[in-house]
Swiss-Prot record:
Residue segments, region Disordered: 447-469
Natural source organism: Saccharomyces cerevisiae (strain ATCC 204508 / S288c) (Baker's yeast)
Protein family: To yeast STB2.
Listed GO CC annotations: Sin3-type complex
Modified residues (Phosphoserine): S514
Function statement: Binds to SIN3.
Record key words, sorted: Phosphoprotein
Annotated protein name in UniProt: Protein STB6
UniProt xrefs under InterPro entries: Stb2/Stb6 (IPR038919)
Membrane-crossing residue ranges in chain numbering: none
Length: 766
């Protein structure tokens, strides 16, 4: 029953269609190649451009690529043609998610080779950085992008516009100086802007994968080792994408690692002046992993040569947790806090005098990893935050290959799956075009499934993916026998006429040369020897076909014979080729007007030389004009700057003049106010005292010397009473004397009353 339901569901599937996806990385990551019934191949599409979205790559979205329509046939992109059902609801689950994400920023556009999802750049978000892939192939520039993007996030690279170019030597030198790499580490660096990786088939064996050369890049390799180290602590969630791209997930994982493990085992916080993956972070993380690795060696739980051999590392870690009863508490084998604390506690009890345990460890392959270093010593001394100290204590493994170029790196011995990325994967399986043709034949002529008999259903139990190869007589090529050819599932009366006509026409048009048809005016008779033309044969008697056209009348409209059309077309082509050969023999390859053509050709070359000379003069004049134009622009910029300075100075001058005018007005107002007050005081004095001396003093000249002498005479006169006292007080000398006398009296008062007992106290202290 379940098998019948499956076949009914397959019979109700929508017809297949061709879909074009230029994002190789997205297709490989979602694992569409795991479905054996999907056929695909690589194709080239003209008139489109592709762009990498920098922020999407950092966020590790499914799609990091957008496609834009240009209409220019010189713009070519490489993509994957996939044969899928027309209804996306019938796609596999992974392709459904990819399709939903594509519809968020693009819309389907039908092309000659299939449906392509195109993005309108005018309505695209301007906050996202678009990197134009000039070569049109994501495979060729992805390694450059990954290296340059990591250098940019490490503050060793430049602008985003250069992420797809060759890595600058200045960025490499800065990275090598910052992370203590020797110059020999970059001997296998990318040497071209676009490098085509070696391709491999999806069915290749492990041995063939191991022989593929790996492009060693220290920047990407260092990031990959950091991501593997974070996965040991169960902090890196992208386990299938440890590809060396310094993404936002790596940044968040490093921050979590510092909060949980960095503060606890190193006693410091993450340096605020460092980047995402600074030297302190690299040394702290890798040294903690190496410390745990050496301590597992001391406990005789680790047999791997390389701490970054993940399978062996997890096996040793699981053995340690099982040995001390920690595996029951952990659902996932990882370096959690409980495991690390137990590892530090147990390994501290181990002594170098334990010769028996030392012999057990020496029997393993520790010397290949440690080299000159002692693993027991390194298990307690390699934990550091200084990168120089870490590099000095590295003697082999992946870290030794990375920093010192010695020993075998990971993946050359065990972890082969990392090399099988979309860069080395060959996107080719089956023939989507042939599958689409068979599908069109099936769905274009199929009858409803209710009309099928039980016997037909039993005969069609064969899987559609298992096809038998037959030979197509019509076109002379191999094809696949699908469900549609197993039983008659179409209306013969409707399909048979057109199918027979097409087959007859193609058979006649592409028919090979044969002896009975040599003199029919269609084929070249010169290629056939004279002996073959003289063929003996039986005398043909008269047939009805010779008089058929005269006896039987054709009624219009009528369908002419497709065989006659094919023969007439071939005859016309043969006559045209013969006429062309005769014309060439008679008139030459240039035709009748060969002499005139030669003269025209000569005149054309002379004119072309003159035009080239004029073009060179125009170029020189254009260069001079551009040079003068640049000088004029520089002078204009200088004048503009001086003009701006003049404007600023004039505005400052106007401002200062306004301030000065305001202050002058304030001074004038203050003087007027003082004059009014002075006049009021004079009037009050005259009103209160009608003395003539006061009026004379007030009306005296403005000379200071005369005024002072007159005031002294008034004060010293005997007739002054209250008025003299007032002027005496107003006199500066009197005020000065009064001040001195008041100070003397106050000093005497304080000395007499307040400090009366001071000498006695001083005596007591002595």
């Amino acid at each position: 029953m379940q098998l019948e339901a499956t076949h009914q569901k397959e019979n109700h599937l929508s017809p297949l269609a061709s879909f074009i996806f230029p994002d190789f990385r997205a297709l490989f990551n979602i694992g569409f190649n795991l479905y054996s019934n999907i056929n695909y191949k690589e194709v080239d599409i003209n008139g489109f451009e592709i762009y990498i979205v920098e922020q999407w790559a950092a966020q590790r979205k499914i799609s990091t690529l957008i496609t834009s329509y240009t209409g220019n046939l010189q713009d070519t992109i490489s993509a994957v043609e996939v044969a899928l059902p027309e209804d996306p609801e019938e796609w596999p689950c992974c392709l459904k998610k990819y399709h939903e994400e594509l519809l968020k920023f693009s819309s389907p556009k039908k092309t000659a080779k299939g449906t392509l999802f195109v993005t309108n750049l005018s309505s695209f978000k301007s906050t996202l950085n678009l990197l134009h892939v000039e070569c049109g192939n994501l495979k060729k520039i992805w390694k450059n992008f990954k290296t340059n993007y990591d250098l940019k996030r490490l503050h060793c690279g430049g602008r985003s516009a250069q992420l797809l170019k060759k890595t600058p030597s200045a960025s490499i030198a800065k990275f090598a100086q910052l992370y203590k790499f020797p110059n020999s580490a970059f001997s296998h660096e990318i040497t071209s802007d676009f490098q085509q990786p070696s391709l491999q088939n999806d069915n290749s064996s492990i041995s063939s994968i191991e022989n593929i050369p790996v492009n060693h890049c220290p920047v990407v390799e260092l990031t990959t080792l950091v991501q593997i180290s974070l996965s040991y602590f169960a902090l890196f969630e992208y386990k299938k994408e440890r590809d060396g791209l310094l993404c936002n997930g790596t940044k968040q994982s490093l921050e979590k690692w510092w909060e949980i493990y960095g503060k606890r085992y190193h006693g410091i916080d993450k340096p605020k002046n460092e980047t995402i993956l600074g030297p302190t972070t690299v040394a702290s993380l890798l040294s903690l992993v190496l410390t745990c690795y050496f301590k597992l060696m001391v406990e005789d739980c680790m047999s791997a040569k390389d701490p970054f051999d993940e399978e062996e590392f997890y096996s040793g870690l699981y053995a340690f947790q099982k040995k001390y009863g920690l595996s029951k508490n952990n659902k996932q084998t990882s370096l959690d806090e409980l495991t690390i604390d137990k590892l530090f506690e147990v390994s501290s009890k181990t002594s170098n005098k334990d010769i028996f345990k030392f012999k057990k460890v020496v029997k393993s392959t520790v010397q290949d990893m440690t080299g000159k270093g002692n693993f027991m010593h390194l298990s307690n001394e390699i934990l550091t935050t200084d990168l120089d100290t870490l590099v000095k204590n590295i003697h082999g493994g992946s870290l030794g290959k990375l920093w010192k170029g010695r020993s075998a790196s990971r993946k050359e011995t065990c972890m082969v799956w990392e090399r099988k990325t979309f860069l080395s994967f060959k996107f080719e399986r089956g023939d989507p075009s042939l599958q689409l043709e068979n599908n069109e034949l099936f769905y274009g002529t199929s009858v409803p499934s209710e009309q099928l008999t039980t016997s037909n259903k039993e005969d069609s139990d064969t899987q559609p993916t298992k096809r038998n190869s037959i030979y197509d007589i019509a076109n002379g090529s191999k094809s696949s026998l699908s469900i549609s050819s197993m039983f008659c599932n179409y209306d013969e009366t409707r399909y048979k006429s057109t199918n027979n006509l097409n087959r007859a026409y193609r058979g006649e048009y592409f028919r090979r040369n044969s002896i009975p048809f040599c003199n029919d005016g269609i084929h070249d008779t010169k290629k056939i020897s004279a002996d073959l033309n003289k063929i003996d044969g039986l005398y043909r008697c008269n047939s009805y076909s010779e008089v058929q056209n005269a006896i039987e009348l054709w009624s219009l409209p009528f369908d002419s014979s497709v065989i006659r059309l094919a023969r007439d077309l071939l005859k016309i082509q043969s006559l045209m080729s013969v006429q062309r050969q005769l014309d060439e023999i008679r008139d030459g390859y240039l035709g009748k007007n060969s002499q005139r053509s030669y003269q025209n050709d000569l005149m054309f070359r002379q004119s072309l030389n003159k035009l080239q000379e004029m073009c060179e003069r125009c170029k020189r004049g254009s260069n001079e004009f551009h040079w003068e134009y640049g000088n004029m622009q520089n002078k204009q910029q200088i004048l503009e700057s001086e003009k701006k300075d003049m404007k600023s100075l004039s505005s400052k001058l106007k401002y200062n003049v306004r301030i000065l005018d305001r202050r002058v007005r304030d001074v004038e107002a203050s003087v007027d106010h003082f004059d009014r007050k002075l006049e009021d005081v004079r009037k009050k004095l005259l009103e209160q005292n009608n003395s003539k001396d006061i009026s004379m003093a007030l009306e005296s000249p403005c000379d200071k010397f005369e005024f002072d002498s007159f005031m002294d005479s008034i004060v010293q006169s005997q007739q002054t009473k209250y008025e003299g006292l007032c002027f005496k007080i107003l006199d500066k000398k009197s005020l000065r004397k009064l001040k001195k006398e008041f100070w003397k009296w106050s000093t005497w008062t304080f000395d007499t009353f307040l400090y009366k007992n001071r000498p006695n106290k001083e005596k007591d202290t002595l």
